[in-house]
Amino acid sequence: MRTVRQRWATGWGRALHTSGSAPAGSSAESALLPEMGQLDPKVAAAPRRKYLSAKYRVVGKLFQQAENGGYLAYRKPAALENPYLDVQARPRVDGATGQIVYQGTPRLSVTRLLTKQWCELRTAYDLYSNMPLFESKAMRIGKRAHRKLENKLHGASDAAATQALERLQLAVPVDPLHRLAADWAGAIDRMCTLFQKGEARELLCHGYISADHGAFVEGPVREDSDVLVSGVIDHLVLTQRGGGSPLSALQPERSLQFPSDMAELVPFLKDLGERRAAEWEVVVGDIKTRKYTQVPSQASVVETSRLQVMYYRRFLEDLGADVDKAYEKLLTNAQRRGLDVDAPLAAGSAISVMEGIPQLGADMLRLVRGDPIGFGPFDSYNRYAAHDTYDFTQHAALLQDQPELQKYAVFFGQWKTPFNLRFLAARMAQLYGCIAPLLSNTLLIEYYMGGECFHVNTFKYDAAELRKHCEDSARFWFGKREIEPIEPTIRNVNAYCKFCDYKDICLWRKEAVLGWKSLGEELRGLP
């Protein structure tokens, strides 16, 4: 019988190791490292000290070698040389079904691909620790800043949905299926907002890379070794092509009448994009929050920030290149998460979408009646599919003696076509297709401090540079190269190691320092 690796990706995977996967932090053995108990009290308050202790135990068990005096080695652990399979996804064969199941997360994110954002050795230690990053005060401030910007632009939609649910005494389930549905509905809302208000925030995108050769998957996703990579775009701006500032958003809703029905809005936007392609462009940007009004000085941090935005732009371009393929890629995205794209969504989810995204109201009526929505692949599938009963009759009692809620009555019955992820994927794919023709080669990094943007870095999209980075990152993730730490120069060690959790137990840093001392002694001995 073939191993999981051979079945998962014939030709590139190594034999599945019986030692299997990196241990989780909660069950790590107490392999204490030399500096344990000597953490700097200034940076190791109780929660952080506890976090570091747990992480050190796990990483020490995997990387510590007696011959190194307890310092952490800078090569991948033996038998765990494929970070994606051994640590991230952790596949195994289900004894009962013979199917491959994943104990971990069988996908990556754009930020996960940026292995050299700081030092790849630190990235590897964190990865193999199997522990989430410690949420620092700076990270919490950054999240709040992002949320504030998002709510300022998109908060009205969320508020409308919340109010409707409260009036109807309904709730949206919080399971993975409904969380993804909410995210996809949010993406639809954001793409509509982009064209109407000239900007959007926190838009989902994704792509696939091949584990076989590390390249972007441009056609259909057919192999398990085509790995899903997801991302969230901080900021998109619809602006005048060749204008003075890429952050000067157009506001088309002031001069154009947008259809309120998605079936009419999609062709309207497609035609609008084609007619205005010479005048308009969509600029993709990322937001970085800072403690001070200073941009990062480390070259690797600046470079990977640029690459991060390039990935987003590339994924948007791929998703918009072929609407039918984008639809299939979205369905695959959900299926890779173990979700059923045809599973009916709860009544609360349907009401939330109708209220939060008015453009989908007419679509909901089409689903109730079993009418086509005007997207071929979706309509063809539902023409022949046998659906389970999708019935909201049990909620009809909520409307009694509430005349202001009677507009929902038509939905509180039996639906001929269920509201599900497949439907949301259809509309998402079509809207991605409206954005792609307008994508700009100018990209942005916006630096914020205290809620204000103090610097904007503009640069050009470089497809060749991105392709090279993707292939290099894939070689790390899929076990085709070793860890590549920072260059062991005095400047680098001073800049990168100072804030590293592993600085006192890192063999790479120790050897670099000893090398400088040895060199200094040799220089002093010169005549």
UniProtKB/Swiss-Prot annotation:
The record's keywords, sorted A to Z, are: 4Fe-4S, DNA-binding, Exonuclease, Hydrolase, Iron, Iron-sulfur, Magnesium, Metal-binding, Mitochondrion, Nuclease, Transit peptide
* InterPro entries from the UniProt entry: Exo5 (IPR016610), EXOV (IPR019190)
Subcellular location(s): the record lists: Mitochondrion
Per the entry, the cofactor note is:
Binds 1 [4Fe-4S] cluster.
A Pfam family it matches: Exo5
Q: What is its main location?
A: mitochondrion
Q: Please verify whether the record's keywords include Hydrolase.
A: yes
From the UniProt record, give one GO term of the biological process aspect.
Answer: mitochondrial genome maintenance
Provide the top EC class. hydrolase
What this protein needs as a cofactor is: Mg(2+); [4Fe-4S] cluster
Q: Which residues bind [4Fe-4S] cluster?
A: 119, 497, 500, 506
Q: Name one GO molecular function term.
A: metal ion binding
For this record, the Gene Ontology CC terms, alphabetical, are: mitochondrion; nucleus
Function, as annotated, reads:
Single strand DNA specific 5' exonuclease involved in mitochondrial DNA replication and recombination. Releases dinucleotides as main products of catalysis. Has the capacity to slide across 5'double-stranded DNA or 5'RNA sequences and resumes cutting two nucleotides downstream of the double-stranded-to-single-stranded junction or RNA-to-DNA junction, respectively.
Quaternary context: Monomer.
Q: What PANTHER family does the record point to? A: EXONUCLEASE V
Write the protein's name. Answer: Exonuclease V, mitochondrial
Q: Which organism is it from?
A: Eremothecium gossypii (strain ATCC 10895 / CBS 109.51 / FGSC 9923 / NRRL Y-1056) (Yeast)
What gene name is given for the protein in this entry?
Answer: EXO5
